[in-house]
Amino acid sequence: MAKIIGISGGSGSGKTTVVSKISEFIPEFVLISQDNYYKSVGDYEYEFSKVNFDHPDAFDNNLFYEHLKNLKKNSPIDMPLYDFINHKRQLKTVLVVPTPVIIVEGIMIFVEERVRNLIDLKIYIDTPNDIRFIRRLRRDISKRGRTLESVIDQYLNTTRWGYYRFIEPTKEYADLIIPEGGHNDKALYVLSTFLKSLSKEGGLDFI
């Protein structure tokens, strides 16, 4: 069975940076982003401004779980792709063929027990709120076609609440908590050394 490494934390915490660091020490892996499992806004009966993207129900949790379960059993999946500009799932999918290591990242991946039980190594990225907000603001404006006001309104109305209600409490499930996100060189060194030693020993059977 494939080994799954889960990386969670609030939006803008530095999950992508940590994934990049891990990739230097794992020769072969596939990356699954929970963001691709958002439900289309068209699936809701109300407009985008009232959709709470920082709630577990915003995700297609059943599909996400089934896909991770299949990958863990070394079965391929057709992963959805999410369009953040139009807030809809794209018609095309991506064929994902499992590798010995699966890296999964997302803000809510530790919320559901059934998903947690599939993850062999859980990493939580703990980054100060102001840093996360600035990163999210820059990303959403430059890459997702958002306005300054819409990002601020979303943060005040749903994002901040969702973080304290659903995301931060999942730290208790983490095997490793990395403060300061992807810029904590000491923590990343410890993590990379651990993963490198495992790969030299012939795999990640330890986790």
UniProtKB/Swiss-Prot annotation:
Family annotation (HAMAP family): Uridine_kinase
Entry superkingdom: Bacteria
Reactions the enzyme catalyzes: uridine + ATP = UMP + ADP + H(+); cytidine + ATP = CMP + ADP + H(+)
Pathway assigned to this chain's UniProt record: Pyrimidine metabolism; CTP biosynthesis via salvage pathway; CTP from cytidine: step 1/3; Pyrimidine metabolism; UMP biosynthesis via salvage pathway; UMP from uridine: step 1/1
Binding-site positions, ATP: G9, G10, S11, G12, S13, G14, K15, T16
Similarity section: Belongs to the uridine kinase family.
Gene responsible for this protein: udk
Keyword Nucleotide-binding: yes
Enzyme Commission number(s): 2.7.1.48
InterPro entries reported in the protein's UniProt record: P-loop_NTPase, PRK/URK, Uridine_kinase, Uridine_kinase-like
EC primary class: transferase
Annotated Gene Ontology cellular component terms: cytoplasm
Signal peptide: none
Protein name stated in the entry: Uridine kinase
UniProt entry keywords in alphabetical sequence: ATP-binding, Cytoplasm, Kinase, Nucleotide-binding, Transferase
CDD domains: UMPK (cd02023)
Subcellular localization, as worded in the UniProt entry: Cytoplasm
GO biological process: CTP salvage; UMP salvage
Annotated GO MF terms: ATP binding; cytidine kinase activity; uridine kinase activity
Pfam families: PRK (PF00485)
Main location: cytoplasm
